[in-house]
């Protein structure tokens, strides 16, 4: 598991997700990456340093290496969604701010479980989705397949063709 909340994580979602996962029956390694601006690093480290399953990193320059090695990603609905998608990493995400709410890519059609706004997320809902994802190999493979089917390599061309098509429809009216 990789927990990756980009930015300063002002809502302390990294700790909330870690604490919630540890309250379940899940007993495998959990990597947590927090950004340079994360202010609760000392509290986070001291709280979980005795747990041999938890590794906490701050200001990591090779985030993509961690994403590549992850079986499941827990993240904010940020640009990391594209990395996860390109690698086919089953992902659960939440919106942590208004900017992320505008990112329409993070949805089930693209193989991503989006739990919506972090402010209104019930821990029970996260636990249910998390355990379902951990325990359901078919679901993870389905998410992986949806993600890998998306052509991110030709993103500019894809967007350009959509814009041209919409423009043609507009002109034809």
Question: For each predicted feature, which ranges?
Answer:
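Nucleotide-activated sugar donor-binding and catalytic core shared by glycosyltransferases
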Residues: 1-173
């Amino acid at each position: 598991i990789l927990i990756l909340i980009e930015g300063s994580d002002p809502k302390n979602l990294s700790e909330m997700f870690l604490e919630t996962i540890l309250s379940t029956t899940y007993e495998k390694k959990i990597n947590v990456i927090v950004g340079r601006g994360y202010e609760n690093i000392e509290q986070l480290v001291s709280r979980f340093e005795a747990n041999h399953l938890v590794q906490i990193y701050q200001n990591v320059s090779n985030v993509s290496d961690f994403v590549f090695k992850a079986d499941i990603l827990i993240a904010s609905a940020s640009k990391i969604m594209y990395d996860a998608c390109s690698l086919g990493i089953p992902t659960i995400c939440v919106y942590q701010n208004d900017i992320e709410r505008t990112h329409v890519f993070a949805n089930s059609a693209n193989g991503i479980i989006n739990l919506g706004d972090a402010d209104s997320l019930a821990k029970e809902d996260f636990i249910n989705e998390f355990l379902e994802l951990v325990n359901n190999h078919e679901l993870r493979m389905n998410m992986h397949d949806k993600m890998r089917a998306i052509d991110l390599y030709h993103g500019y061309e894809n967007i350009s063709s959509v814009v041209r098509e919409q423009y043609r429809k507009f002109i034809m009216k």
